[in-house]
C-alpha cells in the first residue's frame, strides 16, 4: 500500500491596517507553499478518528522545533529543514487569555478539549502560538503553517504554527485566533474555504470566524476551486463533527421584535419587524401567528432586520406574534409579543376554516403528529412539516446533514437541498430515494415536493 503524502498548507490571512497593537505590522500580501512529505503513522483514538486534545503553546522561554516527521510529543515537525527556535508569545497575559478563549469558543461545538498545559501522555494536536516565520526559514508573509494529509484524514499528533509575532494592526487578536483555528483545522483534515466567515478562509473581514454548517467552495484569494478531497464544496462543521465528535453547541440567535409593541392594537395587514443578532450565519427567519408559521424567509449575512405583513384575511382577535430565527446549526432564538386586532373572538364563526376560538384567539388545534407519524397536511405535525417520498406521507423535520444522530434512533437525515436535510425513517431510505416533500406555507396546506438525495 502506498503511503499517504502530507501537504503543508500556509495560512496567509491578511490583517487590516490600523493603530498598531503588536510589535510588528502584519504582512499585506501572502504566499502559499505546498510541501509533500511522508505522513507519520496514526493510532486509533477514542473520539471518532482523530485526537481529542488541542494544546495551545505560548512557548514561554521559547520553543525548539526539530526537523523530520510530525510528532507534537517530541517537538518534531516536517516543516523546518533545520532545528528552529521560536520566540515566545509576544503579547500580554490578557491578550493570551483572549486568544485562548476565542479558540476555545471556535472549537466548542466539537469533542476536543482546548488546553494550555501540555498533556502528560497520549496523542494530541499542538498549536504553537509564538515566533515569526523567519525563525523557521519561511517567507515573511506567512502567518501560519501546518501539515495536512493529501487524503484529508486527521493526524494523530502534529504541530500547527500560528506566528504570533507576525500579527499586528487593528483586530490582531481576532485574526490570531482565526489563524490558530485555521492551522489546527488543516491538521484535522480541512482544506481552505472561499467563505470569509469560516476560519479556513484566506479572505478578510466578517468578524469572528466559525466552522460553518454550509457547503462552501474551496479556494484562497483567486476565486472558488474544487476541494482537495470533497469535490466542489466542503462543510467544515460536518468534517470536524465526524473527526472529533460533537461538543457543546452554542446558544441560538438573539431575536427582538421592535414593532409592534407588546399589548398594541393593530390594524388589518399590520407590519411585523424582527431584529436578529447572530455571530455565526443565519439560516432562516420564521413569522408565527397564534402558533402557526405564516412566513419563512431565508437568512441574509448582510441583514439583521426582517419584516412581514400579516395577511388581510387574518381573523380579528388576540394574536401571539412570534419571530423565530435559526442559525446554520439549526439552533433557534425567539421573541414573542401579543397584540389585538379588532375585537377578541368569541366563537369559531369568525375564525378561518379548522380554527378554534380560545381565550380570544383564533388558532388551529395544536398538532399531535410526531416525526414518522402519518399525515395529510402540515397542520397534522408538531413540526408543521408533512413530507412524502411518493409512497407515504409522514411528519418530518429539519436536520443537520452529515451529523450522526441528528434525527434520533431509527431515522436518517436525507438531503433536501445543498445545506438542508429532513428526517425520514431509516427503513424507508434503503436504495435509491424517490423524493420527499416540504411544508406548505400559510394556512396548513399540503406539502410541496423536494428531492431527497441519498
Residues of each region from the PLM?
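Secreted, cysteine-rich disulfide-bonded mini-domains of extracellular proteins
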Residues: 342-435
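Extracellular Ser/Thr-rich, low-complexity/disordered mucin-like segments
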Residues: 433-446
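A cross-kingdom C-terminal cell-surface attachment/processing module
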Residues: 446-454
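Metzincin-family zinc-dependent endopeptidase catalytic domain
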Residues: 36-39, 44-53, 59, 91-193, ...
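Primarily auto-inhibitory N-terminal propeptides
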Residues: 21-85, 90
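Bacterial N-terminal signal peptides
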Residues: 7-17
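Long, low-complexity serine/threonine/glycine- and acidic-rich segments characteristic of extracellular
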Residues: 251-343
Amino acid at each position: 500500500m502506498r503511503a499517504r503524502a502530507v501537504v503543508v498548507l500556509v495560512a496567509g490571512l491578511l490583517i487590516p491596517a490600523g493603530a498598531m497593537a503588536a510589535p510588528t505590522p502584519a504582512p499585506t500580501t501572502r504566499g502559499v507553499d505546498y510541501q509533500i512529505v511522508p505522513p507519520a503513522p496514526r493510532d486509533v483514538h477514542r473520539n471518532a478518528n482523530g485526537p481529542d486534545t488541542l494544546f495551545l503553546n505560548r512557548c514561554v522561554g521559547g520553543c525548539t522545533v526539530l526537523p523530520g516527521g510530525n510528532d507534537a510529543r517530541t517537538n518534531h515537525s516536517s516543516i523546518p529543514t533545520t532545528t528552529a527556535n521560536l520566540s515566545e508569545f509576544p503579547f500580554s497575559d490578557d491578550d493570551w487569555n483572549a486568544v485562548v478563549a476565542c479558540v476555545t469558543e471556535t472549537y466548542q461545538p466539537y469533542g476536543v478539549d482546548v488546553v494550555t498545559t501540555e498533556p502528560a501522555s497520549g496523542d494530541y494536536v499542538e498549536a504553537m502560538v509564538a515566533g515569526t516565520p523567519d525563525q523557521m526559514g519561511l517567507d515573511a508573509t506567512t502567518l501560519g503553517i501546518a501539515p495536512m494529509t493529501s487524503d484529508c484524514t486527521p493526524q494523530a499528533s502534529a504541530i500547527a504554527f500560528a506566528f504570533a509575532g507576525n500579527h499586528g494592526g487593528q483586530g490582531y487578536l481576532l485574526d490570531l485566533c482565526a489563524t490558530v483555528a485555521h492551522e489546527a483545522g488543516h491538521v484535522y483534515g480541512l482544506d481552505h474555504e472561499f467563505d470569509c466567515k469560516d476560519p479556513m478562509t484566506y479572505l478578510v473581514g466578517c468578524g469572528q470566524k466559525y466552522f460553518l454548517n454550509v457547503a462552501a467552495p474551496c479556494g484562497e484569494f483567486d476565486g472558488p476551486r474544487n476541494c482537495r478531497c470533497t469535490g466542489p464544496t466542503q462543510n467544515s462543521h460536518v468534517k470536524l463533527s465526524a473527526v472529533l465528535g460533537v461538543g457543546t453547541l452554542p446558544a441560538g440567535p438573539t431575536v427582538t421584535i421592535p414593532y409592534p409593541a407588546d399589548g398594541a392594537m393593530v390594524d388589518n395587514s399590520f407590519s411585523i419587524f424582527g431584529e436578529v443578532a447572530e455571530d455565526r450565519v443565519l439560516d432562516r427567519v420564521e413569522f408565527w401567528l397564534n402558533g402557526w408559521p405564516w412566513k419563512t424567509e431565508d437568512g441574509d449575512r448582510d441583514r439583521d432586520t426582517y419584516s412581514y405583513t400579516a395577511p388581510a384575511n387574518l381573523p380579528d382577535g388576540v394574536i401571539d406574534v412570534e419571530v423565530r430565527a435559526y442559525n446554520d446549526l439549526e439552533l433557534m432564538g425567539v421573541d414573542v409579543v401579543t397584540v389585538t386586532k379588532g375585537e377578541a373572538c368569541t366563537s369559531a364563526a369568525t375564525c378561518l376554516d379548522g380554527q378554534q376560538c380560545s381565550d380570544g384567539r383564533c388558532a388551529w388545534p395544536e398538532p399531535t403528529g410526531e416525526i414518522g407519524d402519518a399525515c395529510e397536511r402540515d397542520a397534522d405535525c408538531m413540526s408543521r412539516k408533512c413530507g412524502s417520498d411518493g409512497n407515504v406521507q409522514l411528519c418530518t423535520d429539519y436536520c443537520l446533514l452529515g451529523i450522526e444522530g441528528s434525527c434520533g434512533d431509527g431515522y436518517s437525515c436525507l438531503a433536501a437541498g445543498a445545506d438542508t436535510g429532513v428526517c425520514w425513517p431509516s427503513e424507508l431510505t434503503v436504495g435509491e430515494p424517490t423524493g420527499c416533500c416540504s411544508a406548505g406555507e400559510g394556512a396548513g396546506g399540503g406539502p410541496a415536493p423536494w428531492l431527497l438525495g441519498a
